[in-house]
């Protein structure tokens, strides 16, 4: 049994369960790779079959692909398309190339207890994307998979069925409990290091856009108080340079994600004063006027205080390069999606955040869905350049992905995505997201607690 688990290390982690139950060996991976190579060299065609969903369900039931049966039974569609490659029938929710001969740039290499399927670099498709070791990210993913298995949830079909059976509230409560448990563990680790001879003084919190940094910071503050500490916090956003001084992209638009958007010299100067015992007046950035203002907000670190700094560039080593690393505790927040549509269809990790941002931007009147989608490629490029390089430097990685997230987001996102005009370039992405959301049953947000990371995005 082959399962595409998730995107990682610029490729996809694949688990391969052998029929004899023995561990996967490098020789096993080599044999799978050889068969894949043969299929590519033979230019075996992909055939698309559009049928009524009952027919597709029957095909996959006979093949024993119950992951696909559960997904298709619960998605509510009337017609569906599936593909065949030779004698092998499978399902893919997007479009495939005409034949396997198009797949010239790839590799399959052993990794941990499975393999990594390496794919082309999206910017240089004639060569493989560079392999980037991500042990901490993989460990978070493995931990989430373990909890999913304990609850009997391998794929979206399992989650849908649980919701249909009236267990959505249970899933929400378990998801909240697991996140709170992790936050408690992080707070206790910070407290332990605060009491150590090196004495951690600063907690740095970062993550890509819409990962839940602000809400996480608030919830961590509560748990730090429960440990007996007095958290004092601010955001790097308040140290943005005035808009006229903001770096620009080649097209002349503002590069708001650039590291130099933050006045890191002023920020570091204030942090050094704070940890030296001084009282500091910190700025508040006015996003309407684009000016950093000083309105009398003062911070001070007393006995038992610990400083929390949250923002996109919080883990950039240049931000506080005059402060010893031993005094810093780094936290990276990401949405590491552990649930797949089925055994062969992963969910892109960025889809969580894009949908969160579309809903949040629209509800707050900041941007339309079309504008958010249009700007998303720039956001992703900035994350790859400025944020993700420091992910593995974190002391702790926190997964803010929510087990029933897409089911909760569906009712919010569908009406917003429907506002994207059909005659604009962003419509294809809006349509893809709408189609993707159809795989999830509706789950009401009424059971989402007010302190939930999800609540910040859905209101």
Feature-to-residue mapping (PLM):
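Conserved NTP phosphate-binding and transfer environment spanning the P-loop NTPase/kinase superfamily
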Residues: 194, 320-459
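P-loop (Walker A) phosphate-binding loop of NTP-binding proteins
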Residues: 208
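Hydrophobic anchor at the beta1->P-loop junction of P-loop NTPases
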Residues: 203-205
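Conserved glycine(s) of the Walker
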Residues: 212
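Hydrophobic positions on the alpha1 helix immediately C-terminal to the Walker A/P-loop
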Residues: 215-220
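Conserved nucleotide-sensing/catalytic segment adjacent to the nucleotide-binding pocket
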Residues: 232-234, 241-290, 306
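Auxiliary tRNA-acceptor-end handling modules of aminoacyl-tRNA synthetases
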Residues: 2-181, 186, 191-194
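Post-Walker A helix-loop "phosphate-sensing" segment adjacent to the P-loop in P-loop NTPases
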Residues: 222-232
């Amino acid at each position: 049994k082959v399962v595409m688990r998730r995107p990682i290390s610029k490729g996809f982690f694949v688990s391969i369960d052998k029929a004899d139950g023995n561990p996967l060996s490098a020789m096993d991976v080599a044999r799978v790779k050889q068969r894949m190579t043969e299929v590519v060299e033979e230019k075996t065609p992909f055939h698309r079959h559009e049928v009524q969903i009952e027919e597709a369900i029957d095909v996959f039931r006979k093949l024993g692909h119950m992951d696909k049966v559960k997904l298709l039974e619960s998605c509510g569609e009337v017609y569906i398309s599936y593909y065949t490659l030779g004698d092998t029938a499978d399902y893919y929710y997007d479009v495939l190339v005409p034949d396997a001969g198009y797949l010239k740039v790839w590799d399959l290499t052993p990794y941990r207890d499975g393999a990594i399927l390496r794919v082309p670099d999206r910017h240089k498709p004639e060569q493989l994307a560079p392999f980037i070791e991500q042990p901490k990210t993989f460990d978070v993913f493995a931990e989430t998979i373990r909890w999913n298995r304990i609850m009997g949830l391998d794929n979206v079909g399992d989650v849908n069925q649980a919701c249909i059976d009236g267990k959505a509230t249970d899933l929400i409560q378990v998801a909240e409990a697991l996140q709170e448990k992790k936050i408690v563990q992080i707070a206790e680790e910070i407290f332990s290091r605060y009491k150590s001879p090196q004495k951690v003084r600063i907690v740095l919190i970062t993550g890509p856009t819409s990962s839940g940094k602000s809400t996480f910071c608030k919830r961590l503050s509560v748990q730090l108080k429960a440990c007996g500490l007095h958290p004092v916090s601010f955001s790097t956003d308040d140290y943005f340079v005035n808009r006229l001084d903001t770096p620009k992209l080649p097209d002349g638009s503002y590069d708001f994600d650039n590291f130099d958007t933050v006045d890191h010299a002023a920020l570091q100067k204030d942090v050094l004063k704070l940890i030296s015992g001084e009282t500091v007046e910190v700025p508040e950035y006015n996003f309407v006027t684009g000016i950093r203002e000083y309105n009398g907000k003062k911070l001070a670190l007393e006995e038992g205080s610990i400083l929390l700094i949250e923002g996109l560039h919080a883990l950039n080593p240049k931000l506080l390069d005059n402060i010893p690393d031993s005094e810093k505790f780094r936290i990276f927040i990401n949405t590491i999606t552990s649930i797949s549509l089925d055994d062969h269809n992963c969910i892109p990790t960025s889809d969580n955040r894009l949908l969160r941002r579309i809903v949040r931007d629209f509800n707050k009147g900041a941007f339309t869905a079309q504008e958010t989608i249009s700007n998303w490629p720039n956001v992703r490029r900035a994350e790859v350049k400025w944020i993700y390089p420091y992910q593995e430097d974190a002391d702790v990685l926190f997964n803010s992905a929510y087990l029933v997230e897409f089911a909760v987001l569906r009712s919010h996102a569908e009406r917003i995505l429907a506002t994207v005009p059909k005659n604009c370039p962003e419509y294809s992405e809006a349509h893809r997201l709408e189609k993707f959301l159809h795989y999830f049953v509706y789950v009401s947000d009424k059971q989402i607690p007010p302190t939930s990371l999800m609540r910040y995005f859905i209101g």
